[in-house]
């Protein structure tokens, strides 16, 4: 019956009907034939409306789920101690970046430029942790690349497009997800060119890498081999558009403060009108770095085009002893909290005395490792205890004080009081 009603496309005498709304070919403007089915122009339009509404709802949902700068800062505060200026800069930059992605789908007349980020700060000041926390908060794919391993295409080393392959691996080769991810490129200062003047010889791990990264950071379609594959001519590649990927580059930039000071001194002039620089300013490296200008980065060894692709610059200060003590105890995933949890699994309480925390912070400062060195110090002083503890009985508490850190003495072990053995009843 239904076959008679729909008709066959090859039978010109039969009246054809839409398989969805049931209208005949005479009641609609156009009837499109498929394999044993028909759809009219009205149903096609209705389907388009349904899809459009769903896309708008999805975009609305994405807008509502995008945290505001203040909310981003609040989350960063839970994991990263200090560095308020850098955190505020990052919060605004990341919020604007994902708003820009939304605006591209609306076909606005004004096209918003991409704003990648450069983090400048000493080792262990929190650059990588900031980038990781942002990616976790926004629930986007995230990968870390080491700039020192990168070389120009055709040379021994990692091709810059390997960065995108790593990002794809993080999201199971979902290209759409990867295209809205975050890439953190560490040690970016190590690829500065060796001199201010362009070199005649090839600098495959310096200026050459900067040139190779330019297009990737600005926005290009990168060809990446599929899962488990290696590049060869006969292979089909995955095409990944990098224009919406947020690139965060970080580096210690040792010596940049001297470049900034030299510029400031030149600007001061000489003679009666010269500005007198205080001796205190020489000590405040963090404050000097906060005055960084694009020309300073170019003088340091980044090429002008590369500096232009990183318009947002956030500087981080060197962490002092009070900040390191806070890092040990306050963040959600603080090092002391992690070790306390490990000992708790053995039904043992772990206590760090205030003098121990201060000694750990001083040791990290002496080693110039910043927050990154804190875990190494705690690991080393607790290693023997963590080795012996599972085999020991009746230990209720482990105490770490200054002597454990400074003199490498053993932590104090406090044992549970053993119940006195019951007296045997005397037989009369």
Swiss-Prot record:
CDD domains: RecA-like_ClpX (cd19497)
Entry's Gene Ontology cellular component terms: HslUV protease complex
GO molecular function per UniProt: ATP binding; ATP hydrolysis activity; ATP-dependent protein folding chaperone; protein dimerization activity; unfolded protein binding; zinc ion binding
Domain of life: Bacteria
Biological-process GO terms, alphabetical: cell division; proteolysis involved in protein catabolic process
Keyword Aminoacyl-tRNA synthetase: no
The UniProt record lists the keyword ATP-binding: yes
Alphabetical keyword list: ATP-binding, Chaperone, Metal-binding, Nucleotide-binding, Zinc
SUPFAM superfamilies named in the record: Glucocorticoid receptor-like (DNA-binding domain), P-loop containing nucleoside triphosphate hydrolases
Positions that bind ATP: 122-129
Residue sites binding Zn(2+) per the record: 18, 21, 40, 43
Domain ClpX-type ZB intervals: 6-59
Self-association state and partner proteins as the record states: Component of the ClpX-ClpP complex. Forms a hexameric ring that, in the presence of ATP, binds to fourteen ClpP subunits assembled into a disk-like structure with a central cavity, resembling the structure of eukaryotic proteasomes.
Family: Belongs to the ClpX chaperone family.
PANTHER family referenced in this protein's UniProt entry, alphabetically: ATP-DEPENDENT CLP PROTEASE ATP-BINDING SUBUNIT CLPX-LIKE, MITOCHONDRIAL, ATP-DEPENDENT CLP PROTEASE ATP-BINDING SUBUNIT CLPX-LIKE, MITOCHONDRIAL-RELATED
Entries under NCBIfam families matching the protein: clpX (TIGR00382), PRK05342.1 (NF003745)
HAMAP family for the chain: ClpX
Role this protein plays: ATP-dependent specificity component of the Clp protease. It directs the protease to specific substrates. Can perform chaperone functions in the absence of ClpP.
Protein name in the entry: ATP-dependent Clp protease ATP-binding subunit ClpX
Source organism of this protein record: Xanthomonas campestris pv. campestris (strain ATCC 33913 / DSM 3586 / NCPPB 528 / LMG 568 / P 25)
